[in-house]
C-alpha cells in the first residue's frame, strides 16, 4: 500500500501495456504497408478490432497510468508534505482494477470473426453433431430459410437426454468453447445443443420461435463503433452484436472506476499539505500544480463518460431509448457526452508534460522560470477552456453554423495560453548557461512535437478545413503527434529526470540517446507523411488504399519500425542500468548543479551558494532507503553547509 510501490507498479504496468499497444500498431502498419490487405487478408472486421483495441489501450492504459499513477503517486505526497496519500488501501485497489480493464480490451483484438450465429439478443455457438446435419445446416445458410437445422434432433426426441457421442467434423471451421472432462453425453448435449429444450417447449406450447440470423462475418465480434463508441453502432445490437462491444464497454467502465478511485486519494491534498502551503501555489513545484489541476479535470469528466457508456449498455440490453431516434432518443447526444469527456481528456494527457518541462528547464538553464505566475494561469485557462470546445469534433454531424462559429472561435483562443507557455520557455532559455544533457534533449524534442501538433490542431479549428480533412489521415497525424509525440516525450523527459529517484540507479546515457534519436525520428517519419495523405483525401478507418499512395504509406511503415527500435533501446537501457546496478548519488536526487550564486526556494527553505564542488562531494547513498526511512518533514533536518571561500 506504500504510494511509492504503487507508483512503480503503475510504471511497470504502463510499460507492458505500451508494448501490447505497439504490437497492435505494428499489425496496423503491416496491413497498410502495401495495398491489397497483405496482413489481414481482406478481413475488415479484424482490422477494426485491432485499431479499436490499439486506441483504447494507448489512451486509457498507457498515458493515463504513467502520469496519474506513476508521477502523481510518487511525487505529490512529497511535494505537499504528506507521508502518503489520503487512502492508501483504496489507492492499491484502484491500481489492481486497471489490469482487468486492460485484459478485456486486449481480448478484442484476438476475437474470431468467422462463422458466428446471432440469435436475437442471446448468442451461442452452433455445433452440428454429424455430417448430414452439417449438410442440412449448409443448405439452411445458402437459402432454404424455412428449414429448421434442429428438426432431426427433435425427431430423435428419445435421445433428448442420452445423445450419441459427438463425432468430430473434419474440413470445417467450427471450434468448441466448452470442455467436458468426463465426456458425459448429457453435458455434451446440454452445451452444444442448448436449443433442444427450447425447441421442445415451443413444440408443446405452439409458440412462435425466435428468428435466427447466421452470417459468415457476424456482428458478434464486430466493433464497428470504434474507440469513440459512436452511436447507433454501439447502442444497437443490429450493428454490433452481443459480445465485443459489451466487453469494450465494461472495460472502459472499469478504467473509469480505477481512475476515479485513484484521483480521490490524491485530490484530497488540501487536507494533507504542510502548514503554510495550502493556498500558496508558488511554493509548490509546477509538476505538482499541473497534476493536481488535471486530477480535478478527471474528477469532472470521468463520470460523464461512465454515464454515457452505461446508457449505451441500457439501450442494448434493457430496451431503453436514450440514443434510439425511432423511439424519441438522440444518437447525437452520445457524441456530445463522449466529446465533453474526450476533449478535456486531451488536455489531461498533455498538461502534466507542461509541469515536467517547467521542472526540467530551470535545472538545465541554471536560472528561474520566467514568469511562473503567468505559466500557472496559462495552464488553468487552457484546462478550463477545454470544457467549452468539444463541438469542434462534431462539425460533420449537422451542427448549425452559429454553433460551429462559436466552437471555432474558442478553439482558436486556446492558442493564446499555449503561446504564453512557449514564449516563457524561450525567455528562460535566452542568455542562460545551458547544460546540454540527455534530459534537456528530450525536452527540446518535446517542444518540437508540441509545436507541430498544436499548429495542426489550430488549423483543424477552421470549419471549412475540418470538414474537408476530418475523416482523413490528417487527423490521425495530428493526434498521434500530440500523444505519441508530445505527451510521451514529456513522460520520457520526466522519467529520465527522476530516474534515480524512481529506480535508485543511474540511467544508461548511451541507450538513452539511442532511444531519443530512434523514437523521435520514427514518430516524425511515421506520422508526418500522413499529413500529405490527408490533404490528398485518403480516408482513415479503411484497411486498404489505392496503389497511388504506396509511397507515403510505405514510408510511414518504415518509420514505425524506427519507433519500435527506439522503444527497444528504452528497455535495453532499463536492463543495462539495473543489471550493472549503477549507484545514484544524492546530487541527482534534486539538488541542482549550479556553478554560480543562486537562491532555490523549496518550501520556505533557502539553500544558498551550492556549487558543483559541494554536489560532487556528497556521499553516495541508497536513495530508495533514504526515501522510505525519512518522511518529508524530516527533510528540513538535512542541512548541507556551503563551502566558504
Swiss-Prot record:
Pfam families (UniProt xref): COX1 (PF00115)
Binding site for Mg(2+): 470-471
A cellular component annotation (GO) from this entry: mitochondrial inner membrane
Residues binding Cu cation, per UniProt: 343, 392-393
UniProt: O2 binding residues: 347
Subunit structure: Component of the cytochrome c oxidase (complex IV, CIV), a multisubunit enzyme composed of a catalytic core of 3 subunits and several supernumerary subunits. The complex exists as a monomer or a dimer and forms supercomplexes (SCs) in the inner mitochondrial membrane with ubiquinol-cytochrome c oxidoreductase (cytochrome b-c1 complex, complex III, CIII).
Name by which UniProt lists this protein: Cytochrome c oxidase subunit 1
Gene source species: Paramecium tetraurelia
Name of encoding gene: COI
Amino acid at each position: 500500500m506504500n504510494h511509492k510501490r504503487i507508483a512503480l507498479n503503475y510504471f511497470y504496468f504502463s510499460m507492458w501495456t505500451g508494448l501490447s499497444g505497439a504490437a497492435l500498431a505494428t499489425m496496423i502498419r503491416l496491413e497498410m504497408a502495401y495495398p491489397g490487405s497483405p496482413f489481414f487478408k481482406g478481413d475488415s472486421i479484424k482490422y477494426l478490432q485491432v485499431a479499436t483495441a490499439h486506441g483504447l489501450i494507448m489512451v486509457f492504459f498507457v498515458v493515463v497510468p504513467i502520469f496519474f499513477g506513476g508521477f502523481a503517486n510518487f511525487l505529490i505526497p512529497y511535494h505537499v508534505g504528506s507521508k502518503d496519500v489520503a487512502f492508501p488501501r483504496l489507492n492499491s485497489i484502484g491500481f489492481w482494477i486497471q489490469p482487468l480493464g486492460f485484459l478485456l480490451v486486449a481480448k478484442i483484438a484476438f476475437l474470431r470473426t468467422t462463422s458466428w450465429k446471432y440469435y436475437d439478443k442471446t448468442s451461442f455457438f452452433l455445433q452440428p453433431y454429424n455430417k448430414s446435419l452439417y449438410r442440412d445446416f449448409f443448405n439452411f445458410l445458402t437459402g432454404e430459410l424455412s428449414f429448421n437445422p434442429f428438426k432431426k434432433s427433435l425427431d430423435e426426441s428419445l435421445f433428448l437426454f442420452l445423445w450419441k457421442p459427438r463425432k468430430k467434423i473434419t474440413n470445417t471451421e467450427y471450434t468448441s468453447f466448452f470442455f467436458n472432462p468426463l465426456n458425459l453425453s448429457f453435458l455434451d448435449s446440454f452445451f452444444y445443443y442448448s436449443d433442444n429444450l427450447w425447441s421442445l417447449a415451443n413444440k408443446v406450447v405452439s409458440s412462435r420461435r425466435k428468428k435466427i440470423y447466421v452470417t459468415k462475418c457476424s456482428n458478434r465480434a464486430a466493433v464497428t463503433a470504434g474507440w469513440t463508441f459512436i452511436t447507433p453502432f454501439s447502442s444497437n445490437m443490429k450493428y454490433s452484436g452481443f459480445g465485443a462491444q459489451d466487453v469494450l464497454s465494461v472495460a472502459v467502465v472499469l478504467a473509469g472506476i480505477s481512475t476515479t478511485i485513484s484521483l480521490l486519494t490524491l485530490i484530497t491534498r488540501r487536507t494533507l499539505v504542510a502548514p503554510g502551503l495550502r493556498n500558496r501555489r508558488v511554493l509548490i513545484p509546477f509538476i505538482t500544480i499541473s497534476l493536481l489541476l488535471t486530477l480535478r479535470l478527471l474528477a469532472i469528466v470521468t463520470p460523464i463518460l461512465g454515464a454515457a457508456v452505461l446508457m449505451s449498455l441500457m439501450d442494448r440490453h434493457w430496451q431503453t431509448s436514450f440514443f434510439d431516434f425511432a423511439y424519441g432518443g438522440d444518437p447525437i447526444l452520445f457524441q456530445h457526452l463522449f466529446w465533453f469527456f474526450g476533449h478535456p481528456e486531451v488536455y489531461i494527457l498533455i498538461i502534466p508534460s507542461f509541469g515536467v518541462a517547467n521542472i526540467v528547464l530551470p535545472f538545465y538553464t541554471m536560472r528561474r522560470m520566467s514568469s511562473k505566475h503567468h505559466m500557472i494561469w496559462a495552464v488553468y485557462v487552457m484546462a478550463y477552456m477545454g470544457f467549452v470546445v468539444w463541438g469542434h469534433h462534431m462539425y460533420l454531424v449537422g451542427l448549425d453554423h452559429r454553433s460551429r462559429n462559436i466552437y471555432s472561435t474558442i478553439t482558436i483562443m486556446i492558442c493564446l495560453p499555449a503561446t504564453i507557455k512557449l514564449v516563457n520557455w524561450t525567455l528562460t532559455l535566452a542568455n542562460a548557461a545551458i547544460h546540454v544533457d540527455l534530459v534537456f534533449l528530450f525536452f527540446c524534442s518535446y517542444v518540437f512535437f508540441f509545436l507541430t501538433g498544436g499548429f495542426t490542431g489550430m488549423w483543424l479549428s477552421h470549419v471549412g478545413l475540418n470538414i474537408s480533412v476530418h475523416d482523413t489521415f490528417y487527423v490521425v497525424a495530428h493526434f498521434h503527434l500530440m500523444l505519441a509525440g508530445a505527451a510521451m516525450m514529456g513522460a520520457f523527459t520526466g522519467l529520465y529526470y527522476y530516474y534515480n529517484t524512481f529506480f535508485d540507479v543511474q540511467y544508461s546515457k548511451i541507450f538513452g540517446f539511442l532511444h531519443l534519436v530512434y523514437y523521435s525520428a520514427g514518430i516524425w517519419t511515421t506520422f508526418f507523411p500522413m499529413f500529405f495523405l490527408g490533404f490528398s483525401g485518403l480516408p482513415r478507418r479503411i484497411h486498404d488504399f489505392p496503389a497511388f499512395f504506396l509511397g507515403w504509406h510505405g514510408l510511414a511503415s518504415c518509420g514505425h519500425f524506427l519507433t519500435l527500435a527506439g522503444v527497444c533501446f528504452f528497455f535495453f537501457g532499463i536492463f543495462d542500468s539495473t543489471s550493472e546496478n549503477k549507484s545514484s548519488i544524492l546530487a541527482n536526487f534534486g539538488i541542482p548543479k549550479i556553478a554560480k550564486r543562486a537562491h532555490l526556494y523549496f518550501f520556505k527553505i533557502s539553500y544558498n551558494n551550492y556549487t558543483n564542488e559541494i554536489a560532487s562531494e556528497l556521499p553516495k547513498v541508497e536513495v530508495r532507503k533514504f526515501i522510505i526511512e525519512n518522511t518529508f518533514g524530516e527533510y528540513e533536518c538535512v542541512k548541507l553547509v556551503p563551502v566558504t571561500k
